Amino acid sequence: MEETVVRDKAVESACVVIGLMQGGQHQVAEMVTRLSTGDWFTAKVSACGLFTAAYKHVSEPDQRSLLRAQFDILAKDTDTPMVRRAVASNVGNFAGVVEGRLLLSDVIPVFEALASDDQDNVRLLAVEQAGKVAKSLVDQHLENECATHVVPVIKHAVEDRSWRVRCAMARGFAKAAHAVGPKLTTVELLPCLTSLLQDHETEVRAATIKDISSFVDLVGAATFAREVMPYVLALLQDVNLNVRVALSDACMKLAPKLGQEHTMTHILPMLQAFLRDESAEVRLHILLQLDGLAEWMPAMAEQVLPLVLELGQDIIWRVRRAVMVSVPLLTERMGVSYFEENLLELYLQAYRDSVNEVRVGASEGLQRLCNVCGADWLQEKVLPRIHSFYDESTFYLIRIAILNALKKLANGEGSAASVLVEDVLQLVLRGAHDSIPNVRFTAVRALQEMAPHLDAGAVDSQVRPCLTELMQSDPDDDVKFFSAQALESIR
């Protein structure tokens, strides 16, 4: 079969079937051998995907020896790079099932040969398997062999003439480092890591920085800050957007692992640079992950929060929305007084933003703000302003956003909701008589959801008459429909 997708699915299914079989060891070994000795490369490629499942299934030494030998033969197929590519893709999985010293004698040489293949598209697949091969050696209590057989492959891949191979190694570098362990990583692989961070290809630098935070766990915060962080900081000046975006993600993952001292020394300057970055995507990545810095927010408030407040007026609506989403978090960490002095006006103005998603972002945090600031404070400082926005609004979508926000607030749990529910109810009842049908049926649905949280007297005296009137006399069919639906649900 020449269609790759069909072959791949057939191999996947065959592996599942082999794993479920109780017997048939001879037939399985025979099938793999027949495919691997076929005339067409397609059969050989399929065989490569079956070796792992077949080797696990058979138990006779002769059959296993035959499979290892056949795997080696396919790895030396000089006529067909596609076959060697298939072997390279599967060498890590195969290494995971070959036992003891046979792994060293029969599979590791295959891995090393493929990692130095003339074809770069073979090498890149082989070096991606370095982590799996190293883990197999460790699992077989052969961890000392990693220094001899895996680390040299990693070092050569980092210096490979093909950027695609270096990029493949960068993608798998963290996994390989964790497999070989902290000692080898600190002594042998940190120079490789810093080399990848300085690679002249942007794809390599971006791939390397993506998992950089995992190295703190391996080598410790102090070693990482001393040996690696200078090269990470250098990427702040990178002209490539993909690198800066990857670095902004890595920055937020590094902070919790490095601790407060290193965060204030190294991460804080990065944060300030990213929040001023010309790319909205970079700014957005930082804002969406501010919760990772929550623990140290009070310590860095003077340097970071003014920049966050500036972004509340950003021309990109996604950035403004991200600021609104972060407001409750900042309030939790900085306190009610800080919110009132610095964030309240910015937060309230979001309800009048021209973009609906920004208004929604603000409304989603209202319940959380109530939990932090208290219902009485919210009733005194926030609700009157929101009411005035509703009254002054000439744009019906703003009124809808306000109704949805207040509905969530009234439907919250605890005593706070009961304190605010009367205020909310009066505005929602006004919304039910708005001149715009969309606002009216939004209010109707809000009344339906609020009804279980209201006392019976309020439902009978205010909610039910309002819904009945709308169901009977509203000129809009949608409003009538939702009113009837709401009445049915509260009976």
List where the protein language model places each region:
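Alpha-helix N-cap/helix-start positions at coil->helix boundaries
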Residues: 4-5, 41-42, 80-82, 120-121, ...
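HEAT/HEAT-like alpha-solenoid repeats
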Residues: 1, 23-36, 61-75, 101-115, ...
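Eukaryotic alpha-helical solenoid repeat scaffolds
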Residues: 6-9, 19-24, 42-45, 84, ...
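Eukaryotic tandem repeat interaction scaffolds
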Residues: 357-358, 367-433
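Hydrophobic residues within the alpha-helices of tandem HEAT/HEAT-like
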Residues: 13-20, 50-57, 90-97, 114-115, ...
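Alpha-solenoid HEAT/ARM repeat scaffold
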Residues: 8, 12, 45, 65, ...
